[in-house]
Amino acid sequence: MLISGANPTHVSAALKRYDVEKLAVATVASHTALQILRGAKRFGFRTIAVAGRADAAEFYRQFGFIDEVWTADFRNFVKTAEKLVEANAVLVPHGSYVEYVGWRQALEAPVPTLGCRELIRWEADQYKKMELLQRAGVPTPRVYKTPEEVDRPVIVKLFGAKGGRGYFLARDREELRRRLAGLGEYIIQEYVFGVPAYYHFFSSPVYGRVEVFGADIRYESNVDGRTFGWVEPTFVVVGNLPLVLRESLLPTIWKYGVQFAKAVEEAVGCRLAGPYCLESIIRDDMSISVFEFSGRIVAGTNIYMGYGSPYSVLYFDRPMDMGERIAHEIREAARRGRLEDLFT
């Protein structure tokens, strides 16, 4: 089924009709919603949380910085998106948004959506994701098309945003063949030895730059637990830990972020706007291998909610978390008549 995506003309027309003095910022009630909506409220925007369950809605209603909490059927999100347009709202997407509503609906939703919406289509395919990273010229793990090519330990990843669920390691091709039986869509990657590091970036059309904003480590069950070799390791993300990088690594990490932003514009055809993440392993020789990306805000940015990221102060001379950074960009774009540079 070919999905064309939201009509850019309709999105542009919606933005032109919006009252920029009364903009609302909306997001799905999960993932980084608290951070996004808190930041939006601090910058003077009305805020809307869209929940898929009544119990989630009840939880989000307790926070005074959220003006409205809606309950929606995510199986028909286009209808909710139309209501958001009527509410003069823009949508900030995150990983749970794409997982809950599905990438096809995320492409079709008529509400102005932060960032390069077409990138969602690429993120639905693990092979296209690796193609984009390679096009960016960042070092990546080797990808194997068949088990017969495998000559070292590998990790198998399922397609889609699943928080690491269903991923597994295989030590050799025999183990790999056995465990691939009956699996859906997946990619086989070289398993890189080192420590994980996830880099948060912000691409700013308003300021014409890519900012390196912070970093985190994922806390995964059960690979990070006390399993003592008794169970097969799994990689389900349950939380995130803060990470301050060696300063000598920052120029390389920033360069990779810039190269990735350029590759998206060239290959996907739309400019990155807002937060994104490159996910990597750092080896003991300090070399970096980037194995994954997210084209929007990642949950790891929650580690500095309310405190500000360790690097935001370098750009603005005051700490700012990613929710506040998004709101700052929206406010400045609205003031300068440049909302169309942020939303697709």
Curated annotation (Swiss-Prot):
Family note: Belongs to the phosphohexose mutase family.
Catalytic activity from the UniProt record: 5-amino-1-(5-phospho-beta-D-ribosyl)imidazole-4-carboxamide + formate + ATP = 5-formamido-1-(5-phospho-D-ribosyl)imidazole-4-carboxamide + ADP + phosphate
Reported cofactor(s): Mg(2+); Mn(2+)
Keywords linked to the UniProt accession: ATP-binding, Ligase, Magnesium, Manganese, Metal-binding, Nucleotide-binding, Purine biosynthesis
Residues reported in the UniProt entry to bind 5-amino-1-(5-phospho-beta-D-ribosyl)imidazole-4-carboxamide: H31, S96, N240
Pfam families: DUF1246, DUF1297
Function statement: Catalyzes the ATP- and formate-dependent formylation of 5-aminoimidazole-4-carboxamide-1-beta-d-ribofuranosyl 5'-monophosphate (AICAR) to 5-formaminoimidazole-4-carboxamide-1-beta-d-ribofuranosyl 5'-monophosphate (FAICAR) in the absence of folates.
Protein name: 5-formaminoimidazole-4-carboxamide-1-(beta)-D-ribofuranosyl 5'-monophosphate synthetase
EC number annotated for this UniProt entry: 6.3.4.23
Binding site for Mg(2+): E279, E292
Molecular function via GO: ATP binding; ligase activity, forming carbon-nitrogen bonds; magnesium ion binding
Gene: purP
Cysteines joined through disulfide linkages: none
Keyword Plastid tagged: no
GO BP annotations listed: 'de novo' IMP biosynthetic process
SUPFAM superfamilies for this protein: Glutathione synthetase ATP-binding domain-like, PreATP-grasp domain
All residue ranges annotated as the ATP-grasp domain in the record: 130-324
Binding note for cofactor: Binds 1 Mg(2+) or Mn(2+) ion per subunit.
Domain of life according to the entry: Archaea
Organism encoding this protein: Pyrobaculum neutrophilum (strain DSM 2338 / JCM 9278 / NBRC 100436 / V24Sta)
Known pathway: Purine metabolism; IMP biosynthesis via de novo pathway; 5-formamido-1-(5-phospho-D-ribosyl)imidazole-4-carboxamide from 5-amino-1-(5-phospho-D-ribosyl)imidazole-4-carboxamide (formate route): step 1/1
Binding positions for ATP per the UniProt entry: 153-198, 220
Keyword Magnesium: yes
